Amino acid sequence: MASESTNGKQARSHVTKGRRQYQHQHQQQQQQQQQVRSRSSVSECDGDDSFIFEANEAWKDFHGSLLGFYENGELCDVTLKVGSKLISCHKLVLACVIPYFRAMFLSEMSEAKQALIEIRDFDGDAVEDLVKFVYSSRLTLTVDNVQPLLYAACILQVELVARACCEYMQLHFHPSNCLAVRAFAESHNRIDLMDMADQYACEHFTEVVECEDFVSVSPQHLHKLLSSSDLNIDSEKQVYSAAIKWLLANPQHHPKWLDETLAQVRLPLLPVDFLMGVVAKEQIVKQNLKCRDLLDEARNYHLHLSSKPVPDFEYTVRTTPRKHTAGVLFCVGGRGGSGDPFRSIECYSINKNSWFFGPEMNSRRRHVGVISVEGKVYAVGGHDGNEHLGSMEMFDPLTNKWMMKASMNTKRRGIALASLGGPIYAIGGLDDNTCFSDVERYDIESDQWSTVAPMNTPRGGVGSVALINHVYAVGGNDGVASLSSVERYHPHLDKWIEVKEMGQRRAGNGVSELHGCLYVVGGFDDNSPLSSVERYDPRSNKWDYVAALTTPRGGVGIATVMGKIFAVGGHNGNAYLNTVEAFDPVLNKWELVGPVSHCRAGAGVAVCDCLTSQIRDVGHGSTNVVDCM
């Protein structure tokens, strides 16, 4: 017992000494912890003096060892038989990465205990490539192996590989193969690849239509393509031609799909001469009652546009242009926080939901009147920072240049422009001394201005639009206060007649037409910016309020694009705005869209009937880059 006690004391002394040595080492370890962490091995010390050592490098060794076992056929416990190919591997490794095998090996299935498992209806090379990926995390994709690999990855539920295959196939899309890839994706329920293929087909629609696969697409897929607003086309004629091409090649589908297919063509947007000279004479259209109804709808749309009465006419998706044919939204001039007017213009790409800078005007212009007529943009009057302007310039997308045109008789800012039957009307406005009731009419062909009957009330900062054979002047300021009154011009009578007034006084408001109604947006009630929006129906001579803007906007510019009203910039009482929002009349809701680059109010906004690709992007090098305050 004595000797045991003595040995115990010696042992305790040794442990105490060892503990002191360890504590010293522990302190050194703490000082070197950052260096240790920077290496592949990580160590930590807990409060109870325990020591945690983590070696990340070991995982690489582990991974490398597994790959070596596989390549050398060592310690394998299962062989996959795919056709004539035998693949020796490890159940545990397969179960870790491939959910299909995990479910198999953890179940009561007979295969769970078999050393040889036969897999039918797979490509042997594809399964072998997948197994190699399990061990190596590497996979080589080629145009030859990607489809069998995607099939195997989908069935075996290896989502990482399936996504990689989809992305690889996307990189190799071509007009001649995108429809076949889409059909392959649909057969394997790869929604992501289907969407990728559809997006590509829409972007390259006119090329895809010329390929052999086009007439072989399913009627359901054709329906989806033709209904898309994203079709990259120059004219709805191209969509009609594509539909007829497919229909003539697939008469077996006519009983169910003839009128359904033609209904996806936006016939109302076709020119009248094309409607009557081509569509109305097509035999398969003439012989189908529902197709004739669609043709009547298109005719009624054109009658409605010409202001002829059409009972029960309704706007539909077929009367809404597709994104590529909707025109380009221009934001022209205005001013920002510095007070200096802009000569810059910004153009909105509907597809990208973003703006880019187009060629600048010759003059700086704030509170400028802007309108688009026959595919050209006109900027009239305004103030250049030194004086009021009577000059006018025109932008032609074909030349990407602004050209000076005849000047108005009266120099003014805060004017509104409207076009009715060809001529452009310049309405109201003001200078430093006077609010004007003057109205001038510009004849585009002769490049001359003439005077027409003045309004009943002077209106500076007025809004205007042409609607059903009349030009409307909405709100404004008479030099004393903002106005709620509205009047309209009868060109045949050369006379202005007042109509029902708005519910809210406003000047510096935006005005646009949508679905046969007049919308007035924002503005100022004297100095107070407004978020309210009112709608006027000329058939009932009534105003009603619709959803308000997300923020007050005085000096806002508005225009209608693709069945929505866009409100651009303005001033909210504290700062100039670069935000843009769009109103959906179906949802009765405003939603923010892509902002302009420059905060600006008093800009002119209009939609030009041209293609975004026609406008030269001049980059961000504007002459007036300022903040919004």
Curated annotation (Swiss-Prot):
Biased composition, class Basic residues, residue ranges: 11-23
Domain named BACK: residues: 178-279
Compositionally biased intervals (Low complexity): 24-35
The protein's annotated pathway: Protein modification; protein ubiquitination
InterPro entries: BACK, BTB-kelch_protein, BTB/POZ_dom, Kelch-typ_b-propeller, Kelch_1, SKP1/BTB/POZ_sf
Gene Ontology BP, a term: ubiquitin-dependent protein catabolic process
Domain BTB stretches: 76-143
Assigned keywords, A-Z: Acetylation, Kelch repeat, Repeat, Ubl conjugation pathway
Spans annotated as Disordered: 1-40
A Pfam family reported for this protein in Swiss-Prot or TrEMBL: BTB
Polar residues bias (residue ranges): 1-10
Spans of repeat Kelch: 328-375, 376-422, 424-469, 471-516, 517-563, 565-610
Function: Substrate-specific adapter of a BCR (BTB-CUL3-RBX1) E3 ubiquitin ligase complex required for The BCR(KLHL8) ubiquitin ligase complex mediates ubiquitination and degradation of RAPSN.
UniProt-listed PANTHER family: KELCH PROTEIN, KELCH-LIKE PROTEIN 28
Subunit structure, as described in the record: Component of the BCR(KLHL8) E3 ubiquitin ligase complex, at least composed of CUL3, KLHL8 and RBX1. Interacts with RAPSN.
The name this protein goes by in its record: Kelch-like protein 8
Organism whose genome encodes this protein: Mus musculus
